[in-house]
């Protein structure tokens, strides 16, 4: 019984990995059909549906992975790092690095892969970015308490500016067909971004 569950879990992971790889390839710029995905995995469409009731559920699982990966790591940064600017830098670098390491998933983060899918999926990505922006805002609000001095500009404005930088770099990565990596020249870009945090 345990072997059967493990085999099923492995097949589910194989399906999700194939979907992510297809999103990374030139197929990712077009609608991915279950027929193409089944061919990529080497199974029938019926076999896909034994593991996932719909393609939407496959995307849900990938979004869940993105959420878990980013939110868990953000929480670790907040636990380990106490300096506000360092926290913000690490969170931004985390988002950009995650996108760079997972190009197929970056198409999901930018909404590019979801254009042909249910609106609810884009809503989940929107919620994820709202959560991250709220976290950035909270980090900024805690600065006064932690360091005795807050920002002169509104934290809501600053947090949205930081997130817009991340989204822009991820979009550039997708638009360039993954040529311009989000972390390229980060050490030169960060002082420009950090200078806005007043």
UniProtKB/Swiss-Prot annotation:
The keyword Coiled coil applies. GO terms for biological process: cell division; negative regulation of division septum assembly. PROSITE patterns: HTH_TETR_1, HTH_TETR_2. GO terms for cellular component: bacterial nucleoid; cytoplasm. InterPro entries: DNA-bd_HTH_TetR-type_CS (IPR023772), Homeodomain-like_sf (IPR009057), HTH-type_TetR-like_transc_reg (IPR050109), HTH_TetR (IPR001647), NO_SlmA (IPR023769), SlmA-like_C (IPR054580), Tet_transcr_reg_TetR-rel_C_sf (IPR036271). Residues 33-52 bind DNA. SUPFAM superfamilies: Homeodomain-like, Tetracyclin repressor-like, C-terminal domain. Residues 10-70 form the HTH tetR-type domain. It is found in: Cytoplasm, Nucleoid. Required for nucleoid occlusion (NO) phenomenon, which prevents Z-ring formation and cell division over the nucleoid. Acts as a DNA-associated cell division inhibitor that binds simultaneously chromosomal DNA and FtsZ, and disrupts the assembly of FtsZ polymers. SlmA-DNA-binding sequences (SBS) are dispersed on non-Ter regions of the chromosome, preventing FtsZ polymerization at these regions. NCBIfam families: PRK09480.1. Homodimer. Interacts with FtsZ. Belongs to the nucleoid occlusion factor SlmA family. This is Nucleoid occlusion factor SlmA. It comes from Klebsiella pneumoniae subsp. pneumoniae (strain ATCC 700721 / MGH 78578). The gene is slmA.
